[in-house]
Amino acid sequence: MNRRSFAALLPALAASLPALAESQASPGSGANKKLIETGVYPGFTPPGQFSGRAGHSFFHGMLPTEIGCEAHVSYLAVGAQHEPEEKHTHSEIWLVREGKVELRLNGESHMLGAGDVGIAVAGTMHWVRNAGDTVASYFVLEVGTGPIGH
């Protein structure tokens, strides 16, 4: 293949890159491009007995402005950690509903109680665990440019 033939293929190659990137995304990434619609989303009551964590996603997708958004409520059993310490390309905001949680942000621990809010902007190492002696629950709002994946 000479340079002229190769150059003729470049537009087709460039056009195929977005599809290739999407096909290479891990199947369990959870990225969701579904359009979020205006509305009311029903709540969730956790089972009477659970170990670790329980939760409910209210919505997960894209706002009309191309902003990825996901909202859920999580319930943590005493001592339970939500997930391993990690960072994301999106931001996460927590609003504690009940109980006491420890929110670690870039290695610094913060104790939050009912009504407290914490935020980890994109790129912040973080994790949450139940630091109290009763079930803890909190709402999470995740926002970022592009789809939110898990």
Show the residue positions of the predicted features.
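Ligand-binding loop in jelly-roll beta-barrel domains
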Residues: A122-I148
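Aromatic/pi-system hotspot detector in well-structured domains
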Residues: C69-H72, V117
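Short acidic-glycine-tyrosine-enriched beta hairpin
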Residues: E108-A122
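Histidine-centered metal-chelating micro-motifs
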Residues: Q81-E83, K87, E102, G118, ...
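A generic "binding-loop/recognition-motif" signal
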Residues: A80, T89-H90, E108, T124, ...
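Short, conserved beta-strand element in jelly-roll/cupin
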Residues: Y75-L76, K87-E102
